[in-house]
């Protein structure tokens, strides 16, 4: 178990990459986040799950392993039932585009087939729910199989996994007010079904397909279900803006639809030059609704980190889109507070959040790969007095334009990691802080303090 105090984004320590966050307030009143675990730059997820929890959105506990791929008996078992994950006979517009691009790239290229025993055992996005004294963890694996494991504790460990009669990724679970449980899953194609009373089985004949679609709802993957008053909210990775970096939602009057598309809750495009997908949920904690989502880092589509933003559900049931912030569920950064470079919530250009681990110095993350014209955005800073200085811990050289609320507050020159000046000028208030880089030479940003 590991403890970490932080009320801002990203939520967890910089070396802990938990994407696909499903947030649930459990009977003990604490919020538990169930997600996958990224630990490589060339593959999504890994072979393990870790559950994180908090009682106050600031003090976090990273619990021990909840489930590992090695505990799932049917993975790579040639005799286990196989269920198709995606219907390739009826491609969506996105599928057609990808298939065409893949065909062009692979034209004349022979792909080496790996023996089954060499295939990695990865666990993709999970979900969890409590019923009658038991916590049920629904999970999916790299072979398109899906299953459920159980525990008497919300953080696990989970055991006794049972395979479900379906294939695909991104399971979600929901229990309605009458006690009936529902199961959702699918990539490109969405599916839902009533679970049996044992919470570990269902009748495949009762599966409802196409709950939300790419064509009508911009659905890509990452199903998540909630209910607010009499309205059911189907949250998912949304393709409306060309790639699934958004969390969108559709609403209905039944847990199995029909659902009407409503819009986007948050878009993580711009968190990294290679940002590609999003997956998350909404949940109410201590009277406040939040959206849980992730951001990629290190100039790749992986190393995704848990982030949180407050949201508002309007009287008419709609949810206004919110922007990514550095403050997250916490307060704006005040005078004298340290802002870490990796807390940037928006990046423009080639700059990204990179990592390094040095003997004796440990693990650290910073803004790196900075080119002329790049920008890094931090939302928000706040002061009751006039801003007059900024201190930037950095490496390399460059000229940094400091903008507050889009207006230039000053310029900072850095030479071989030594800051030459610190003066800025801006009236008191709350602002978006932007660093714009020029004449860069090996420039990297570790920390910022503004006064």
Tell me what each language-model feature is:
Residues 1-411, 416-451:
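Carbohydrate-active catalytic/glycan-binding domains of CAZyme proteins
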């Amino acid at each position: 178990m590991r403890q970490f105090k932080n009320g801002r984004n990203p939520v967890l320590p910089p070396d802990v990459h938990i994407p696909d966050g499903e947030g649930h307030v459990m009977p003990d009143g604490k919020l538990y986040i169930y997600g996958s675990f990224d630990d490589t730059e060339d593959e999504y997820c890994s072979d393990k799950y870790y559950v994180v929890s908090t009682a106050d959105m600031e003090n976090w506990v990273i619990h021990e392993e909840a489930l590992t791929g090695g505990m799932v008996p049917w993975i790579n078992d040639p005799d286990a039932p196989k269920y198709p994950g995606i219907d390739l006979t009826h491609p969506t517009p996105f599928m057609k585009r990808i298939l065409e691009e893949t065909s062009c790239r692979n034209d004349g290229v022979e792909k080496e087939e790996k023996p089954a025993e060499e295939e990695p055992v990865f666990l993709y996005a999970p979900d969890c729910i409590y019923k009658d004294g038991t916590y049920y963890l629904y999970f999916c694996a790299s072979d398109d199989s899906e299953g459920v494991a159980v525990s008497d504790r919300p953080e696990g460990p989970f055991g006794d996994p049972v395979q479900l009669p379906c294939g695909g990724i991104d399971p979600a679970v929901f229990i309605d007010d009458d006690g009936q449980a529902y199961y959702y899953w699918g990539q490109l194609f969405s599916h839902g079904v009533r679970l049996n009373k044992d919470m570990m089985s269902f009748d495949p004949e009762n599966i409802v397909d196409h709950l939300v679609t790419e064509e009508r709802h911009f659905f890509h993957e990452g199903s998540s279900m909630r209910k607010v008053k009499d309205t059911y909210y189907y949250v998912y990775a949304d393709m409306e803006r060309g790639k699934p970096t958004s969390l969108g939602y559709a609403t209905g009057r039944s847990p199995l639809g029909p659902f009407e598309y409503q819009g986007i809750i948050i878009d993580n495009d711009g968190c990294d030059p290679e940002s590609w997908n999003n997956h998350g949920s909404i949940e109410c904690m201590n009277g406040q609704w939040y959206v849980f989502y992730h951001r990629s880092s290190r100039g790749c589509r992986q190393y995704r980190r848990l982030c949180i933003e407050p949201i508002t559900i309007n009287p008419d049931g709609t949810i206004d889109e919110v922007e990514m912030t550095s403050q997250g569920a916490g307060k704006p950064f005040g005078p004298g507070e340290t802002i870490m470079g990796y807390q940037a919530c928006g990046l423009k250009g080639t700059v990204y959040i990179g990592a390094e681990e040095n003997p004796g110095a440990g693990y650290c993350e910073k803004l790196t790969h900075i080119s002329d014209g790049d920008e890094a955005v931090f939302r928000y800073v706040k002061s009751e007095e006039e801003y007059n200085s900024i201190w930037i811990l950095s490496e390399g050289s460059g000229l940094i334009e400091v903008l507050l609320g889009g207006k230039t507050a000053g310029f900072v020159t850095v030479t071989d990691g030594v800051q030459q000046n610190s003066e800025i000028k801006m009236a008191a208030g709350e602002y978006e802080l932007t660093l714009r880089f020029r004449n860069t030479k090996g420039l990297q940003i570790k920390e910022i303090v503004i006064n």
